[in-house]
């Protein structure tokens, strides 16, 4: 924690092609070793693949996919009297988006397609259709929260 008070939260600049902060954040999430140009190229090619396959606007498909991935509930560990409980808590909107983007990129990387463009495009398309590993992660997170509903009164 800084001694000089709270650190101001930086706002990302919108992406130049789609004029969207979400796209900028996805580019930053995908970036490895500071290679932003490469990350941008991969994302734009993925969006081209999505547009080609669906015929719809890639941005709309991406937003729908993200909506299907973002969790509403998650569990946090809380120590009470020597026992650790998994306490279900609601996810803040900012964290929802962050988790959604993180899961999208992570599960796209784990896919078996040859190029990252194809992997990302297919993961976005799967998520838009409510299938795929990222959506399964959200479902698992919700199941954990549901299973531990009995400990909800330990919320802080």
Swiss-Prot record:
PROSITE patterns: RIBOSOMAL_S7. The keyword Hydrolase does not apply. The keyword Cytoplasm does not apply. It holds the Pfam family Ribosomal_S7. GO terms for cellular component: small ribosomal subunit. CDD domains: uS7_Bacteria (cd14869). GO terms for molecular function: rRNA binding; structural constituent of ribosome; tRNA binding. Gene3D superfamilies: Ribosomal protein S7 domain (1.10.455.10). GO terms for biological process: translation. Keywords: Ribonucleoprotein, Ribosomal protein, RNA-binding, rRNA-binding, tRNA-binding. Part of the 30S ribosomal subunit. Contacts proteins S9 and S11. Belongs to the universal ribosomal protein uS7 family. One of the primary rRNA binding proteins, it binds directly to 16S rRNA where it nucleates assembly of the head domain of the 30S subunit. Is located at the subunit interface close to the decoding center, probably blocks exit of the E-site tRNA. NCBIfam families: rpsG_bact. This is Small ribosomal subunit protein uS7. It comes from Bacillus velezensis (strain DSM 23117 / BGSC 10A6 / LMG 26770 / FZB42). The lineage of its organism: Bacteria, Bacillati, Bacillota, Bacilli, Bacillales.
């Amino acid at each position: 924690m800084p001694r000089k008070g709270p650190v101001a939260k930086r706002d990302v600049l919108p992406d130049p092609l789609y004029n969207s902060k979400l796209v900028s954040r996805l580019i930053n999430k995908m970036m490895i070793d500071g290679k932003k140009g490469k990350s941008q190229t991969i994302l734009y090619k993925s969006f081209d693949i999505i547009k080609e396959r669906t015929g719809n606007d890639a941005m709309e498909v991406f937003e729908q996919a993200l909506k299907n991935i973002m969790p509403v509930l998650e569990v946090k560990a809380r120590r009470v009297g020597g026992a650790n409980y998994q306490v279900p808590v609601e996810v803040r909107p900012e964290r929802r988006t962050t988790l959604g983007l993180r899961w999208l990129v992570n599960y796209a990387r784990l896919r078996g397609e040859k190029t990252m463009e194809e992997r990302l495009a297919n993961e976005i398309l799967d998520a838009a259709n409510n299938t795929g590993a990222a959506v399964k992660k959200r479902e698992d997170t919700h199941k954990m929260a549901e299973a531990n509903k009995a400990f909800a009164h330990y919320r802080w």
